[in-house]
Amino acid sequence: MSGFGLAGPPPAPSIPGWTHLRTGKVRDLYTNNLNHILLVASDRISAYDWVMPTEIPGKGAVLTQLSLFWFDLLEDIIPNHVVSTDVPDEVEDRAIIVQPLEMFEIECVARGYLTGSGWSEYQQNSAVCGNALPAGLLDGSQLPTSIFTPATKADVGDHDINIDFNSAVKIIGADDAQTLKNLTIKLYETAAEFAQSRGIILADTKFEFGRNSEGEVLLGDEALTPDSSRFWDQSTWKPGGAQPSYDKQFLRDYLVASGWDRNSPPPELPDEIVEKSALRYEEAFFRITGSKF
């Protein structure tokens, strides 16, 4: 069991003029009579396939505003799904109006550094998702070149599974798989270069793509947030173990240390963990954009 636990997802807030479509781990989706989607980022936070029972104040706004920052920065590489930021007052700062997309059925992950599930796989076979890597790398090592490591898309409560490129081809076809691979690496390397100028290492990140009604491939979902990326402080980076980060790793580390059994619903988070998590999200926004949140 995982996801929202026995209580199920929280009730979606009622928003005049919008009809609720579905609730994800973090986002609530609505539609209107113009066939637009209202994408609302909540303050929910997930880890190890569970949605925590405690929210992180301001997190949804950070995710939305940081995504908008990156969407603007990367627009020359690929258009995105944003239609408008003129959203209802009830969800100000944490929602965007977007085009409906037919999403590709893979997660598009790029890695420039070895950590997380990539590190675990490398220890077993010196490769990550079919990308052969040199011997002697450590947890946190920079890779010789950026690699594409796709994953399957999982339902709420299920776990994404890393796959190789050939498996991605079987799911979405050779042409689309190559297109998404090229886009993913280009977006990652452009974003990583920008982040480096801010003293931040973008270790890895996940993108999602879809086609609009005209068949155009667009960047959807979110872009380069602490939920979809690993951000490390360049000044403290040292391969050989866990890196100080501006993302969910802090929460993951706490949960592991707490002794929580991942087969049971997670506990309420202590105030200290909530406050420190909120500060990490705000710090990520500031370090990347140069603006206080």
Question: What are these model-predicted stretches?
Answer:
Residues 172-203:
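A long amphipathic alpha-helix within ATP-dependent nucleotide-binding catalytic cores
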Residues 142-174:
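A short mid-domain helix/strand-loop element embedded in enzyme catalytic domains
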Residues 36, 103-105, 199-202, 214-217, ...:
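Coil-to-beta-strand transition motifs
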Residues 26-30, 206, 214-216:
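Conserved beta-strand/loop block within the catalytic cores
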Residues 241-262:
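Short glycine/proline-rich, acidic loop/turn segments that cap or connect secondary-structure elements
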Residues 208-248:
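Catalytic activation segment of kinase domains across protein kinase-like and atypical kinase folds
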Residues 94, 195-212:
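A short glycine-rich, hydrophobically flanked beta-strand micro-motif that places a catalytic Asp/Glu
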Residues 2-154, 261-268, 272-293:
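Active-site loop/lid in soluble adenylation, ligation, and acyl-transfer enzymes
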